[in-house]
């Protein structure tokens, strides 16, 4: 009997050791040197919820060359930063109840922060928390007139202060997209540096357009340029931008519902690669033969210099 108990304890210890080693090896590999990880969102075509996607379902191309997917896994934990442009018309606060519902519908593995874009900076109102009711309490009326700024500089400020992480990271920007510091003629000069920073840090930037308090934002061409910059920012970071014409949306709910589905169908793709002697960006493409499924992903990734 004693011998059987001893053997059982040894077997249990070996099993636990194998589990711990396996988990550690997976985590170490995902964040190890010579590897790059990017977030991929599976999207069901024609509003169909996408099925689960396995590593074998994915074809990955780096600079047009088929490249092996080293690791493909569900992104369980998410850090979602909500950045609200403080120059928005105060009527946007009519949408806050829907935004609160979106917060509260997120799983406990989602950590939400709330910040306001003002004077080229991200003013933090609530740090990351999975207490979604607490995050919702940070929603307030925007300042409106007099708070004109650059949402792109505020995004850069937010990302520069965001610690590195192997988990999924997204930003939801609610803004007109108008750059009152440097203009949108024809595009804000800070858009490129913003999406490149996001690509380096593997951050998706989603956006919802809302008009700001300045009457000039209601002019078609100015609003159109702002929307174009928001759309480009989303496209370059593997996300989407939501708007309906240049007027204020009647409701954020359809956008937030779609965003919730996207966030629930994200994966982390890891591949082996580096930039050689000098860091660089490389174009990527991700496809699948699964029916009714397509991917949202950044069109290029950052390859750090070889160590």
PLM features: residue spans?
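N-terminal secretory signal peptides that target proteins for export/translocation
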Residues: 1-8
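Bacterial N-terminal signal peptides
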Residues: 11-24
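Scaffold/interface architecture of coatomer-like assemblies
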Residues: 29-307
